[in-house]
Every structure is written in structure tokens, then in C-alpha cells.
Amino acid sequence: MKEFDGKSAFITGGASGIGLGMARAFASAGMKVAIADIKSELLSKAKADIEARGVECLTIELDVSDRTAVRQAATETVAAFGKLHLLCNNAGVGGINRPLDEAEDLDWDWVINVNLMGAVNCLLAFIPLLKAHGEGGHIINTSSVSGLRVYDGRGQGIYATTKFALVGMTEALEQDLKPLGIGVSLLCPGFVKTELPNAPRNRPAKFGGPVAPGHTSNSSLSAAAASGMEPDDCGKLVLNAIKNDEFYILTDGNERDLIQARFDRLTEAIERAAEVTF
């Protein structure tokens, strides 16, 4: 996807953080932007921000775990813009610092239904719209560096499970959509200045309500996020990756050694397997 002016994008989790950074980058390139977010109090400010860049902006209060609501959002977006060219599955939650041996049913339900099934719901609703006009398009799925390796220490399991799943799903999606002229990219941000670590404070009642403070993000991860990349810079990286049809998008090189360590363990296992005799 090389041309952006006059085309349209739909972004989940778009009213703040990385999502808003992408919205600003796309708007600056001339795209019409639909911003969907569960945090309704942020939508009006985000709309004004995007419209100030001279493009149309549609805002939709949306819980991506609600498949029916996602389909309604797709219908509303096409009614407003006519066509859809770019889908960004960016909505996500994290911050439950609870080891897997202590995790509760609703912890799993919440994170899986937002991080993984939220993306699935959007793919089901929006891919037909991307295919319909025959002009091609692009899909961004936001995973995490935690989808490439697990941070040290207990309590990261549920989040990492969903982010690893997004990596596999997106790698398969690229193969499925490539013949149709629809590009796919996998965004794996490291630490970016977002409110993700605070998400458990706002967990919906249907998933158990706010998480107890003792089980929210540990202080070291929260501090790292607070000093991370600016969301606008992340948005610019994404725009550039779409232009260049890049699949993997990482936000910095600081995780190289830790990611390499995981693949070194895999390589060692391959070498051991090659030596096995029965």
C-alpha cells in the first residue's frame, strides 16, 4: 500500500497511546480515520485532534470482545467512508501480574477475549470490506515484544499467551491475504508510553471488575513503559512499514539479546534432536 491520501483506516484502541499515534500518522498522510475505543471519555478529544489535521474522523465506542458490536462498527465505518483500506487491530489489555498457577478464570477470559478474540472479531468483520473494492489494503496486528519472548519473572503468562498467539495468527494471515493484494504487518512494540499497565483498574464488570492492586503490573515494567517511546513515533514507524510492505515492526533494538537468547535455546534443541539415535 503506497498511496494513502483519501483512503480510510479503522483503528481499535485508537483514542490514546499507540492507536492514537497511528491515527495521527495516517491523518497526516491524508487518510480518513475511524477511531474505536472502549474508553468513551477519550473519543471526543481524539476526534478533535484528528480533524485538526484536515481529514474526516469517525469515533465509535467499542468493546472489541463483543462480536456483534464489532460488526456494527464495520457497517458504520463503510457507511461513513464508503470503503475501508487499512485495519489496525490495536486494542489490548495487560498488567495482570498474577502467575499462571494463581490465575483465575476471569483473568483468562478478559485478556484472551480482548487481545486475541478482539482481533479475530475485527478480522471476521473487516476483511470482507477490504476485499470488496479490489483496491488492496493493509492490516496491522499489534502484538508485543512479549509475543517474541517472555519477560523474566512470574506473572506475565496470560498476556504473553495472547501475544504469542497473535504472532502465529498474523504470520498465517500474511500467507492467506498476499494473493489478494492485501498486505499484513505485525507490530511488536517494546516499551511505549501508554496506559496499558493501568488497564486492570478498568476491567469491565463482565470480566470481574477492577483487578486488586496487588495483582496489577509490577513497578519495573510500569517504570519502563513510562520512559518508553513516544506513541507518535511508533505511529510514524507503522506508516513507514506499510509503505515498504514490511512484515515485522519493532520499536527499538534494545530487545535483541533477549530475543536472540530464546532462539539460541531453540537452536540448541534442534542440534540435540539431530544427535538423537534410537
Could you say what each language-model-derived stretch is?
Residues 2-34:
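Canonical Rossmann dinucleotide-binding motif of NAD(H)/NADP(H)-dependent dehydrogenases/reductases
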Residues 144:
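Residue(s) in the substrate-gating loop at a strand-loop-helix junction
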Residues 40-41, 61-72, 105:
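The beta1-alpha1 cofactor-binding region of Rossmann-like NAD(H)/NADP(H)-dependent oxidoreductases
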Residues 179-249:
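SDR active-site lid
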Residues 98-100, 104-109:
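Substrate-binding pocket helix/loop in short-chain dehydrogenase/reductase
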Residues 123, 162:
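Active-site helix of classical SDR
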Residues 29, 149, 172-182:
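Active-site-adjacent segment of SDR/Rossmann-fold oxidoreductases
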